[in-house]
Design a protein with these regions (language model features):
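C-terminal halves and exits of single transmembrane alpha-helices
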Residues: 77-87, 106-113, 117-119
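Short, amphipathic, aromatic/basic-enriched membrane-interface segments that mark the entry/exit
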Residues: 65-66, 84-95
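Small-residue-rich segments of transmembrane alpha-helices in multi-pass membrane proteins
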Residues: 37-47, 71, 98-111
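Alpha-helical transmembrane segments and their membrane-interface exit regions
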Residues: 124-134
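Hydrophobic alpha-helical transmembrane segments and immediately flanking/interface helices
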Residues: 76, 137-140
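Hydrophobic alpha-helical membrane segments
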Residues: 74-78, 95-100
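Alpha-helical transmembrane segments and their membrane-interface boundaries
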Residues: 1-59, 66, 115, 119-120, ...
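Hydrophobic, membrane-facing alpha-helical anchors
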Residues: 12-16, 66-82
Length: 140
């Protein structure tokens, strides 16, 4: 394992924690730990898929790394479903579930060495959570 991989894992965890911190201070169902771990795991799965490509190429076999990313998205869907609840007529947790999916994508971006995309997406996610939440309360 080289230092770049360690840096990727740390960056993914840090970016996930920024998003998780926002959810934590708003007392949502998933917070700092959950979002940090989602981003970290997504980065790890992406890194592993790239390593598997190299391993399979050496053996003369094909490998499709998008299958691992696809499986992650399905898994995040199950995790996200666990934070969605109905309270009377209101459904709560949809934003947190969607944010879990976005955080997973941030981890994938870091694992794929798309650092600018990962950082930009993290801050755009935070902007949407803060800015759009304010707009919803003010106008809807």
């Amino acid at each position: 394992m080289n230092l770049e991989i360690i840096g990727q894992i740390i960056l993914a965890t840090f970016l996930g924690s920024l998003i998780g911190f926002e959810r934590e201070i708003k007392k949502k169902g998933a917070g700092l730990q959950t979002f940090s771990l989602i981003s970290l795991a997504s980065c790890l799965f992406t890194l592993i898929s790239f390593e598997l490509i190299n391993l399979f190429i050496e053996k003369g076999q094909g490998f499709d790394p998008t299958r691992i990313i696809q499986a992650m998205a399905i898994g995040i869907g199950f995790v996200g479903a666990g934070v969605i609840f109905r309270q009377g007529e209101e459904v709560v947790g949809l934003t947190t579930a969607a944010t879990l999916l976005a955080t997973s994508a941030v981890g994938v971006a870091v694992g794929a060495k798309l650092y600018l995309l990962a950082v930009f997406s993290t801050f755009l996610t935070l902007f949407v959570l803060a800015g759009f939440g304010w707009l919803e309360k003010k106008f809807f």
